[in-house]
Amino acid sequence: MVYIDPKHLELEDRVVAINRVTKVVKGGRRLRFAALVVVGDKNGHVGFGTGKAQEVPEAIRKAIEDAKKNLVEVPMVGSTIPHEVIGVFGGGRILMKPAVEGSGVAAGGPVRAVLELAGVADITSKSLGSNTPINVVRATVEGLKQLKRAEEVAALRGKSVEEIIG
């Protein structure tokens, strides 16, 4: 995975989930907050991160910092993805299909956040497994990592791009 420097990108962030987690100790319960945040430049770069802290804003800040360290590049054809892909992480399975221009983002919840911040404007997706936000986000990003441009596929097969496209 190639490191993408977040300093050169204009990143937007979106909080996907905030969880209240409790640790039971002898004196009672200790409350903390866990935040899941997605960042992206709406131009082919997206990442996610998690953060935990005693206060919600601090957890979000940590999650944003973490997300900036985990940026991935998303290959795109116009405003959609180059081919169909299934992203899997844990129990989360996300099917993503390219869509014609103007159809918009047909995705729910955490998947929509990832795809919109990646800059994918036209796509159809379906969540096939777990609906836990962290697994869904990770599965979506795994799917986006699997995407290949026509040039990459042609090079792997030892053919020209024209032969691949058809």
Curated annotation (Swiss-Prot):
Organism lineage = Bacteria, Bacillati, Bacillota, Bacilli, Lactobacillales
| NCBIfam families, alphabetized | rpsE_bact (TIGR01021)
Q: Which UniProt keywords apply?
A: Ribonucleoprotein, Ribosomal protein, RNA-binding, rRNA-binding
Q: Which InterPro entries does this chain map to?
A: Ribosomal_Su5_D2-typ_SF, Ribosomal_uS5, Ribosomal_uS5_bac-type, Ribosomal_uS5_C, Ribosomal_uS5_N, Ribosomal_uS5_N_CS, Ribsml_uS5_D2-typ_fold_subgr
**What would be one Pfam family of this protein?**
Ribosomal_S5_C
Q: Which is a GO BP term held by this UniProt record? A: translation
Q: Which family does it belong to?
A: Belongs to the universal ribosomal protein uS5 family.
Q: What is known of its domains?
A: The N-terminal domain interacts with the head of the 30S subunit; the C-terminal domain interacts with the body and contacts protein S4. The interaction surface between S4 and S5 is involved in control of translational fidelity.
Describe the function of this protein. Answer: With S4 and S12 plays an important role in translational accuracy.
GO terms for cellular component: small ribosomal subunit
Complex formation: Part of the 30S ribosomal subunit. Contacts proteins S4 and S8.
**Domain of life according to the entry:** Bacteria
The coiled-coil regions, if any, are none
A Gene Ontology molecular function term of the record: structural constituent of ribosome
The source organism is Enterococcus faecalis (strain ATCC 700802 / V583)
Name of the featured protein: Small ribosomal subunit protein uS5
| Domain annotation S5 DRBM: ranges | 11-74
